[in-house]
Amino acid sequence: MSLRSLLITTEAVGETTQTSDHQTSFSTRTYNEINDRPSLRIEKDGEKAYCFKNLDPVRYDTRMGEYPFDYGGQSTENNQLQFDLFTKDLKADTDIDLSDDVKDDLKRQIMEYYQQGYRAIFLVRPQNQEQHYIASYSSTNLNFTSQPSIGVNLSILNKIQENKLYIYSTQPHIPSVGCEMIAKIFRTDIDNENSLINYSAPVTVTISVTKATFGDTFVCNHPNMNYQDLIPTMTKNSIYHDVKRITKIHEYINSKKKKKNSTSKIGGIQIAESKDGFWKILTKNYQIKLKFGVEGYGVMGGTFGNWLIDSGFKTVETNYEYQRNGKTINATTVASVKPSRKCGTRSPVFGQLQFSGEMMVLSHNDILTVFYTEREWALSNAIYAKNFATDFKRQFEITAQSDELLVRTNVVPHTIKNTPGKALMEYSHGGFGQIDTSDYTGMALTFRFRCISEDLPEGYYDRDKALAFANVGLTSFQDRQEANGTYWVYNTSTVGFGSCYPKKEFEYDINVTYTTLLPSDPEFTTGGTNYAQSVTAVLEESFINLQNQVNEMLTRMNISDLTSGVMSVFSVATSFPQILDGISDLLKAASSAFKKVKGKVGSVAKRLRGKRYVRLFDENVSIEETPRFLDSIRSSRRPSILSNMFNDDETFTALHTLASRTNSVASDVTYLQPIITTRIANSTPPVIAPASSVTYAKLKDISKIINAEIDPKSIMEFNQISNTISILDSTKKLAQYAVDPDIIDGILNKMVGGHARSLFSLKVRKHLLDAVEKDAFVKYNYHDLMGKLLNDRELLDITNNLSSQKQFELAKEFRDLLINALA
């Protein structure tokens, strides 16, 4: 995977996102239907700068979003994911029996589907997601009860073999919620005929089948299902319960049958862990306390300070503590609102002694983004994170009192008529991001809440709806009530929550699940010597010889703020070492390192990515399906003309390989930390793509800008650093055009695919090729010329032909990239 592609998920909620159920479902990996791209956002707030270089996600719902599956091998088409066999709403504290016909039919269907490669899912969803509940099974010879649970729980029949059932569960204890239904259907003891199941809260039970596969399992005996006879014994990547070793735990089971109130324990559950090569992939479930604030501001101006000249919402940082598993958790959230509408009237004709102004409003479809992080957790040390999911479905309302308005006039009585309005918020989607707060810089979870308040025009409404409108300078509606009980709402009012009100705090307990990529060797985080010797020993001498050249180049380029480590490691890792004099020896060493890691990262790449859509993934690292989460991945299926550019696995692996610290060079080289590599990954290197990869509408827009038709055979470069578009047409003419940055962003957001990120711009590639073959643009036809111009390996071999001046010119361009990356 490309450096940017792999690490973008540390800042982009787009790669792993869960969306709410009310949104539309789409099939995935359908290029004709996928034409929206996320946009780049940067926010700044007063004295602090919060760098959210995120890509807004493109979301594709499937029915499997709430299930924490591992890796399935089938399509994520909705009609292939899951088949429901049984659904029933059950009342609280009511003994429930299933008829023999229903049990036999369900067992028959499950077994038939199992023979076809399907697994059975036993899902229990409480009507109240915040309520604790337990599930129980009772018969003459067997009784068991689950531990108190909250939210959706499921048990999955992963395998049936030798009269044993292999069951995956989202709960860490046995028996889990869902086992009561499994026992009811599969238990063959005659005692099962009179058995009953019971739930302490109203629930909906759903039994379905899927071809997805799952993580850890526990094993129980098929005929008697006696969970009391099970004890856990650990094996690699699974929990196995040996039925041959009988340990009675009646007291424990019976104690759980007593229904009693209990407080929620905020804990973490490790769902799965696996090692593959250099990496460890960890899937965990946490219960976190999300506490955040929404705070507005208003600025009065004008000659006498009676005009509202500015308003909006602050970026609010909240630091707090809470308990989880007996430990104190220090957490930080950063909440920001992006309002899109206003209320009130800006009328200078009123005069300087009267109020005039408009107030920003959090209104229909506006987004509230909350970033959450903890001081000490696995995510903070992760290189990569994906597969974010949460069970949070709750809606909440943001409102205030009219007398809380923050702004005042300088005219007696110093008050301004207003109505704060109301904003109804609902969880929309989430993922991962990178934040810079007052005391933390690193990875964070993101939660995005969408305002679902109705978008209503002026008119007559009942009082409750009228109070949902915000206004300033006037109340939102007339005081006089009409005969039918309605009130007239002014056209200066807007449905939503006004911005000129003090901080409103919210606090919720939320379950989250995510997958992280960590080094399998703990030493690898700082560069284990053994690992470095196995892969990078060939580079050590070259690095040492390079230091003087690096320092000289830094002096010449006047960028002393960039360390030699940044320049040397990043230049080699991103295949741009030709900017330095005498670099050929290091290139050979780097090539050797590439060969050593080649083939060792492919399976890791497959484990990291599903068929869901994220910007700029190489198609040649396509991996199996991960149907449990909702976004589909957009992969850049490279056309043959781009096939010789470096692939993503090579670039990413090289960076982390070369960042290994060794004793021989540790005192001389300062290596990149993960947070720095993330910033570099998001430094938006140029995008190179054939014109056919750009949407027809965008090509027309570009044609208007440059006042020329674009040859459909052209190769195009979109450079977000220099804000230029370069076009190399079939006549071998290379032209560069300066354009507005919004235009480039808009084009990239609509890119159909078939593109590649590269630190070689077309201009640089032309210089490199000219250095070895001055007449290359003359003697080669267009097709052959493109084969040479877009071949990274051939370009690496010609660096000895560059003059110092030519290398210096190329270095200046690369310097701009680094400065942009580390700004």
UniProtKB/Swiss-Prot annotation:
It comes from the Viruses. It holds the Pfam family Rota_VP4_MID. Keywords: Capsid protein, Hemagglutinin, Host cell membrane, Host endoplasmic reticulum, Host membrane, Host-virus interaction, Membrane, Outer capsid protein, Viral attachment to host cell, Viral penetration into host cytoplasm, Viral penetration via permeabilization of host membrane, Virion, Virus entry into host cell. GO terms for cellular component: host cell endoplasmic reticulum-Golgi intermediate compartment; host cell plasma membrane; host cell rough endoplasmic reticulum; membrane; viral outer capsid. InterPro entries: Rota_A_VP4, Rota_VP4_MID, Rota_VP4_MID_sf. GO terms for biological process: permeabilization of host organelle membrane involved in viral entry into host cell; virion attachment to host cell. The record marks R245, I246, K260, N261 as: Probable cleavage. Belongs to the rotavirus VP4 family. This is Outer capsid protein VP4. It comes from Rotavirus X (strain RVX/Human/China/NADRV-J19/1997/GXP[X]) (RV ADRV-N).
